[in-house]
């Protein structure tokens, strides 16, 4: 209750004090507003917008609040004009207007526009009536108290103008509300269009998600298959590793067994795990063996060439021997013919001596003289032939000496010998031709008819002829002696031939020594062959192990190929999974942001609804207080009528009035403090509202609000979205597919719902922000009327504000707790994402390792294929060489048969005369019997070859059979009884079942 004054105050003093107090209060309010207006952070955008009749001092802060300024904004949310009561008990016009505007906004949300208009008009009319009543009361009280009409009328005019301004502001707020309703309709249409677009986008998203689900199902199936194959591959790998370990043990056993034969093979078997080094060593060893084989082939080729040269030399020497034998036989025939001629001449001489008469003595003498000349010429020829034979003998001896030297010097000297022998052969052939001509002449002379018988009785001529015949006989005897000497010379030549044969035997012995050396070489080759057999066995075992290892490698290659395919499929699946996860993360982040914004908006709406309820309660309280004030004013008016009679008493009680003024000042200070506290709380609430809703700066700033909304949406899209939390108990792909489908569907539903809620909350927040802005623009202070009811109203509003602040604090704590929980959830999801990325990195490392192993195996396989191709090429080349050698051997056998035929023909010519022709075959046979050679005697034994010369095939030839037998013995050197006198060919051959010659490669 208001305190009752004991004495009425002086009118002049009370009016002056009232005006001074009002001026001081206005100044303090302005200073307070100026102090509170820079509470917005620096860089914020401030706008002063003066509406129709509104107070130009009211400003609206529309700056964007940063997260660092949220506590300040929360502290600066409440304004002092919303819920304050002046000390005089009259509610401030700003508070009433804000409460009425809030009620009108609430009614506009629920009731059509016509009801809003009627309510606004009724409220303005009621305000005007109240203002008129107050003006009348104030005027009457002023006129009754002191009669100062003009001052009180001026104050009343000020109040009327103030109330008119408030009414104009109310009309403008109505107009703005109407405009806001129009904008709300437009926004509803836009919202409908956006919802239609969202539905279309949802349909498209559903279609895309259906395709993605199918792909995801296929990928999950493939992942399951890959996992099963991975398990199978791991088991197969374990088996292969176990088998490889067993093989390693076996290889170590084999290495210990083969260590005594070949250390290299043992090293290769012990180092079975290091296949690459083993293969390189084996390649090196094979290269060394091929080099040794090539060296042996070169030596063998050189030996064969030397043997062929020796055979050619031997054949040439045999031809020379044959020529000499034929020349010797021809000379013997010539000697026999000469003996026959001598006998014939003796018979003729006897006939001439027996017959005395010779009618044709002159002719006979001439014939005898001619015969003598012929005999002398023949004798000279024979002497020349003897000399030539001696010269040839000397040359032959020199040639034999040269041959021994040539054997040491080999090919060059042998060619010179062949050249000299060819020259000698030509000379001897010329001599033989001369002898043949002489023989033909003698035969012609023998074929002439005998002369007629001479008359009996020797004459002088006959005696002369007889003397000449005796002389001729003597000459013939001398010739016979010369022939005997020549025969002796021939015997010497035969001795020389024997010596030459001995030398040939020595050469054959040297050849035998060479053969023994060849045997030693053969033994070395046998040892090498034994080593090679052991090596071949080891290599066969190694080859088997390599084949097994190749099988393992091929299986490993298959496994690696399958693993590569699996890993590629896994990579594609993981890529698709990542994309789906990113999309789901984006959707979930959008949903979370939408949820947060919807929660914030719902919280803001709840807080605004609470504030609206509080404002309505305060408005009702203010109406009740106003009614009380009007009743009290009537009572006071009656008291003022009574107090006119007590003016004197009031003058006496000035001191009491001063005390009352001081109490009013104190109450004004208390109300100012309460106003400051309320403004701080209002600023805090306004900061919370600006943080939650980001409303516009003032009245009708839809474009800036839309820009803020677009910025919020862009920030929601640009924020990195967490990965979806995939539960760990999803073992089957069906469960995973169902989980992803449900997650996508729920995300879409929540996204659509939260978008709708966000739009609704934004609309509500805009409305509330406009209402708050319009309410904040109203004047916040009025002149306090003297009374006694202000303390109770201020206490109730303070308690209501305290309750609202406690609710806001509790809600703020709940929001902070939810935010902390969400942060923990986000951190957990990020941890899961990091784990998934680590697993994908390990899978990528496994893939890289598989690829490197696969590349190494491919390189090894390629090297093996190249090595096999080189071996096949070498094999084909060796086959071609073997065919060429086989043809050469067959050609040698054919040449041998031809030489056999020649020797047989040469041996059959002197067979008719056993006395003279016997020594030649005996000599040839001696040459065969004395020479136990290791090479093929191409001259051969004449006696067994005579009966078999007609057979042309080399299979029926005993020498060829001997060659084949020797080849078999050479192939199996341990089973060979010995060389003996069997000839051999210095090549390595193999005879098959058909006795065909094939060269084997060691």
Curated annotation (Swiss-Prot):
Family: Belongs to the GOLGA2 family.
Recorded disease: Developmental delay with hypotonia, myopathy, and brain abnormalities: An autosomal recessive neurodevelopmental disorder characterized by global developmental delay and muscle weakness apparent in infancy, microcephaly, seizures, central hypotonia, and skeletal muscle myopathy. Brain imaging shows cerebral atrophy, thinning of the corpus callosum, and delayed myelination.
Free-text note regarding domains: Extended rod-like protein with long coiled-coil domains.
Taxonomic superkingdom: Eukaryota
Gene name linked to the record: GOLGA2
Topology within the bilayer: Peripheral membrane protein
Pfam families, per the entry: GM130_C, GOLGA2L5
Protein name (record): Golgin subfamily A member 2
Compositionally biased tracts (Acidic residues): 702-716
Region listing for Interaction with p115/USO1, in residue ranges: 1-84
Biased composition range(s): Pro residues: 1-11
Outcome of swapping residue 35 to K: Impaired methylation
Reported impact of residue 18 to K: Impaired methylation
């Amino acid at each position: 209750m208001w305190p009752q004054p004991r004495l009425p105050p002086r009118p002049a003093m009370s009016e002056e004090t009232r005006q001074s107090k009002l001026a001081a209060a206005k100044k303090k309010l302005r200073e307070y507003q100026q102090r509170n207006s820079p509470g917005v952070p620096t860089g914020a955008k401030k706008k002063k917008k003066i509406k129709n009749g509104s107070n130009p001092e009211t400003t609206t802060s529309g700056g964007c609040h940063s997260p660092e300024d949220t506590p300040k904004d929360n502290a600066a949310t409440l304004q002092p004009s919303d819920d304050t009561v002046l000390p005089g008990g009259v509610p401030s016009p700003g508070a009433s207007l804000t409460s009425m505007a809030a009620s009108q906004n609430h009614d506009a949300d629920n009731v059509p526009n016509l009801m809003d208009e009627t309510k606004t008009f009724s409220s303005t009319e009621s305000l005007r009536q109240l203002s008129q009543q107050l003006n009348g009361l104030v005027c009457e009280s002023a006129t009754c108290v002191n009669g100062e009409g003009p001052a009180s009328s001026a104050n009343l005019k000020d109040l009327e103008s103030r109330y008119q301004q408030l009414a104009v502001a109310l009309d403008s707020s109505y107009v703005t509300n109407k405009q806001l309703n129009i904008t709300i309709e437009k926004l509803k249409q836009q919202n409908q269009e956006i919802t239609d677009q969202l539905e279309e986008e949802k349909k498209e998203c559903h279609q895309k998600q259906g395709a993605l689900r199918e792909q995801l199902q296929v990928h999950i199936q493939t992942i399951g298959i890959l996992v099963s194959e991975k398990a199978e591959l791991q088991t197969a790998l374990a088996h292969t590793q176990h088998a490889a370990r067993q093989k390693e043990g076996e290889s170590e056993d084999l290495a210990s067994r083969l260590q005594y034969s070949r250390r290299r093979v043992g090293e290769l078997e012990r180092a079975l795990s290091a296949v690459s080094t083993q293969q390189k060593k084996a390649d090196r060893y094979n290269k060394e063996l091929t080099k040794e084989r090539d060296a042996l082939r070169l030596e063998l080729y050189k030996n064969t060439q030397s043997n062929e040269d020796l055979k050619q030399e031997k054949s040439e020497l045999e031809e020379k021997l044959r020529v000499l034998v034929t020349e010797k036989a021809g000379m013997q025939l010539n000697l026999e013919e000469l003996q026959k001629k001598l006998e014939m001449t003796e018979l003729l001489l006897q006939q001439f001596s027996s017959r005395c008469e010779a009618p044709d003595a002159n002719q006979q003498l001439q014939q005898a003289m001619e015969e003598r000349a012929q005999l002398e010429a023949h004798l000279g020829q024979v002497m020349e032939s003897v000399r030539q034979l001696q010269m040839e003998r000397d040359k032959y001896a020199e040639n034999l000496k040269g041959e021994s030297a040539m054997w040491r010097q080999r090919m060059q000297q042998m060619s010179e010998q062949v050249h000299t022998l060819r020259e000698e052969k030509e000379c001897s052939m010329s001599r033989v031709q001369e002898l043949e001509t002489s023989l033909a002449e003698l035969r012609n002379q023998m074929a002439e008819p005998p002369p007629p018988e001479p008359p009996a009785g020797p004459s002088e001529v006959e005696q002369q002829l007889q003397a000449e015949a005796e002389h001729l006989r003597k000459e013939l005897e001398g010739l016979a002696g010369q022939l005997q000497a020549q025969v002796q010379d021939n015997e010497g030549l035969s001795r020389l031939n024997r010596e030459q044969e001995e030398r040939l035997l020595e050469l054959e012995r040297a050849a035998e020594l060479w053969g023994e050396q060849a045997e030693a070489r053969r033994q070395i080759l046998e040892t090498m062959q034994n080593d090679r057999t052991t090596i071949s066995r080891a290599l066969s075992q190694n080859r088997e192990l390599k084949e097994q290892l190749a099988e393992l490698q091929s299986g490993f290659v298959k496994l690696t190929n399958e693993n590569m395919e699996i890993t590629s499929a896994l990579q594609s699946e993981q890529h698709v999974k990542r994309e789906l996860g990113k999309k789901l993360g984006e959707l979930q982040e959008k949903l979370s942001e939408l949820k947060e914004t919807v929660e914030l908006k719902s919280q803001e709406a709840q807080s605004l609804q609470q504030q609206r309820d509080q404002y309505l309660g305060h408005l009702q309280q203010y109406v009740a207080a106003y009614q009380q004030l009007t009743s009290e004013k009537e009572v006071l008016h009656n008291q003022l009528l009574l107090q006119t009679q007590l003016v004197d008493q009031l003058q006496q009680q000035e001191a009491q009035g001063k005390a009352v003024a001081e109490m009013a000042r104190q109450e004004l200070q208390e109300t100012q403090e309460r106003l400051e506290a309320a403004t701080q709380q209002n600023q805090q609430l306004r900061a919370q509202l600006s943080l939650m809703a980001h409303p516009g700066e003032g009245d009708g700033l839809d474009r800036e609000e839309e820009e803020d909304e677009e910025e919020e949406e862009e920030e929601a899209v640009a924020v990195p979205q967490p990965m979806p939390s995939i539960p760990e108990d999803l073992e089957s792909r069906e469960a995973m597919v169902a989980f992803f489908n449900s997650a996508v569907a729920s995300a879409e539903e929540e996204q659509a719902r939260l978008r709708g809620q966000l739009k609704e909350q934004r609309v509500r927040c805009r409305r509330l922000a406009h209402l708050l802005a319009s309410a904040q623009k109203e004047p916040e202070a009025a002149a306090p009327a003297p009374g006694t009811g202000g303390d109770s109203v201020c206490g109730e509003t303070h308690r209501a504000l305290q309750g609202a602040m406690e609710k806001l604090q509790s809600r703020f704590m709940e929001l902070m707790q939810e935010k902390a929980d969400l942060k923990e959830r986000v951190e957990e999801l990020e941890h899961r994402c990091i784990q998934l990325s680590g697993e994908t990195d390990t899978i990528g490392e496994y893939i890289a390792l598989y690829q490197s192993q696969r590349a190494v195996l491919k390189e090894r396989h390629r090297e093996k294929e190249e090595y096999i191709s080189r071996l096949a090429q070498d094999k084909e080349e060796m086959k071609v060489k073997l065919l060429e050698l086989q043809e050469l051997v067959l050609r040698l056998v054919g040449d041998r048969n031809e030489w056999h035929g020649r020797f047989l023909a040469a041996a059959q010519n002197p067979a008719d005369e056993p006395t003279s022709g016997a020594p030649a075959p005996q000599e040839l046979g001696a040459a065969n019997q004395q020479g136990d050679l290791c090479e093929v005697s191409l001259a051969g034994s004449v006696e067994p070859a005579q009966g078999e010369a007609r057979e042309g095939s080399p299979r029926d030839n005993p020498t060829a059979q001997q060659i084949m037998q020797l080849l078999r013995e050479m192939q199996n050197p341990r089973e060979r009884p010995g060389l003996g006198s069997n000839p051999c060919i210095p090549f390595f051959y193999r005879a098959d079942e058909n006795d065909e010659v094939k060269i084997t490669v060691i």
